[in-house]
Amino acid sequence: MSAIILDTETHDMKGYPIEIAYIPCSFIDGLLTVDKQAVYDEYFSCPEPISYGAMAVHHILESDIAGKPSFETFRAPACEYIIGHNIDYDIEAIRKADPEFKAKAICTLALARMVYPDQAHNISALVYMLTSGSEKARESIRNAHNAKQDVLLTAFVLKIICNDLGIKDMQSLYLFSEQARIPTHITFGKYKGTAIKDIPSDYVSWLLKQPDLDPYLKKALIKG
């Protein structure tokens, strides 16, 4: 398959994946299409207890994953693109099971921030905004933070973003995502909130020497 929209729920922040869901998607005649009949959604066990903080978000209990296959048994399908809301988090999670997984990452969170800069950007808020607070949206959102529901809501938001940007193929979507992920302002440190182009050159030089520098921030700093 060419692309999947994927979401994970983890046992703790940046933890083991205990629920993984994905749905195949593609562009047909220039329109983003998802195959709802092919949704994958499974629970997995892990070697550590689910934190109560994580439990409060996704409502997955120890009893839900008892007797389930280990997360280590998961293998992502071969695909060229992987799409998700803050997709880097999900890629990190599934690589705990499948370290060799590789695909071009498309981040709907970055795209939403670019297209709707003045809105809240979590999936639930975006769905409410795009449906003008409809009852149908509320019905769907009440199940949000279930991985399966999250991929379906992400697909809904992404279809509208593609329409707003005139995107008609997956490679163009990827390129828009790459551009959207390059920050225009610094989000931490002594110059937090400052436009990248206005950061003093000595601070830029220092940042560029940091070993854990975000690759997209690095692009922004080099571009200036």
Where are these regions (language model features)?
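Conserved non-catalytic scaffold segment of RNase H-like nuclease domains
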Residues: 1-113, 117-145
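Acidic, divalent-metal-coordinating active-site segment for phosphoryl/phosphodiester hydrolysis
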Residues: 11, 146-157
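A residue-level signal for conserved active-site and pocket-lining positions in enzyme catalytic cores
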Residues: 83, 150, 154, 193
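Short amphipathic alpha-helical interaction segments
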Residues: 145-146, 196
